[in-house]
A protein has these predicted regions:
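Rossmann-like NAD(P)H-binding beta-loop-alpha module
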Residues: 74-138, 149-150, 157
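General beta-strand structural signal in soluble alpha/beta enzymes
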Residues: 14, 27-30, 53-55, 78-82, ...
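Conserved active-site and cofactor/substrate-binding residues in soluble primary-metabolism enzymes
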Residues: 15, 23, 62, 85, ...
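Substrate-binding/catalytic subdomain of NAD(P)-dependent oxidoreductase enzymes
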Residues: 118-119, 129-227
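Rossmann-fold NAD(P)-binding glycine/threonine-rich loop
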Residues: 35-47, 57-88, 92-94
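Rossmann-fold NAD(P) dinucleotide-binding segment
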Residues: 13-55, 59
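Short, small-residue-biased leader/transition segments that mark boundaries at the very start
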Residues: 1-3
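Catalytic, metal-anchored helix/loop core of enzyme active sites in primary metabolism
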Residues: 103-108, 116, 131, 137-140, ...
Length: 266
């Protein structure tokens, strides 16, 4: 296991990627955050035929279709169901229903959903953020959550897997919740909704703050929950829900990917 924190016994862990390569792993699991060096590590291992399970949405979004193709060409499995939606099977739905999907509406960041709920209940932005950090939903540096960078990476994955569209973060109009405060009580529920859709004008996406009716399925996501609605060309809809923040939803998705690879290849 390659880890940044050097506070563990050297006999159990390593901070050297060379040690990982020397161990000749069958599967590599990436639960780091930044694009670098994670993307390079993944490419190196996939090139060796090592299967990769990744929760690193930023690295996978940056790698895009070329990374997926690279894994296939090297007969390695690349799985990243935990990279968007936490415990909600958003990416699985995208891959299964690609070609039928016309629109996706989703809450893709459980941290900000929790914070917006607390702010709507009367807390200040600072108190809501501290509470989210204390509960393990928000990182010590919450900038990617609040400015939409985290949700933006997930939107890129939905665009790629659900619509076959490769976009960059700057293509996505994003509302920030940094220092957000309600100027007047919400009529319904304040949510930051990610939307991707394709129509005769092409493909579009956005991340926006919305005051939703309480009857709306998206509005019914409480705390760190995440909800999504898939719309299909035949008029059908499919609604999914799950935990969108915290260590356990991510862990469950990582383990599910690991078990899938184990069942297929070992």
């Amino acid at each position: 296991m390659c880890i940044r924190d050097r506070g563990y016994s050297p006999s159990e862990l390593t901070t050297s990627f060379d040690d990982v390569l020397a161990s000749k792993p069958d599967i590599f699991i990436d639960v780091s955050g930044p694009i670098d060096p994670a993307l390079d590590y993944c490419k190196t291992l996939l090139g060796m035929g090592v299967h990769v399970v990744s929760a690193n949405k930023q690295a996978i979004a940056a790698g895009g279709q070329s990374l997926i193709d690279f894994a296939r060409d090297n007969k390695a499995h690349l799985m990243f169901s935990s990279a968007a939606g936490g415990g909600m099977p958003v990416l699985e739905m995208c891959m299964r229903e690609r070609g039928r999907i016309t629109r996706v509406e989703a809450l893709l960041n459980g941290t900000t959903n929790y914070m917006l709920g607390e702010i709507s209940a009367g807390k200040s932005y600072a108190d809501a953020l501290k509470d989210a950090q204390d509960k393990g939903f928000a990182e010590a540096d919450p900038s990617s959550d609040v400015n939409g960078g985290d949700a933006g990476a997930k939107i890129r994955l939905i665009a790629l897997l659900g619509f076959g569209e490769e976009i960059v973060l700057d293509d996505i109009p994003r509302d920030t919740i940094e220092n957000f405060a309600l100027t007047e009580p919400a009529k319904g529920a304040m949510k930051r909704v990610a939307t991707c859709w394709k129509d005769r004008n092409g493909f579009s996406t956005k991340l926006e703050l919305k005051d939703l009716s309480l009857n709306n399925f998206i509005a019914q996501a409480d705390g760190e929950e995440a909800h999504a609605i898939f719309y299909f060309e035949d008029g059908d809809q499919y609604k999914i829900r799950g935990k969108g923040a915290g260590r356990w939803p991510t862990t469950e998705s990582v383990m599910a990917d690991l078990f899938d690879i184990s069942a297929t290849y070992f």
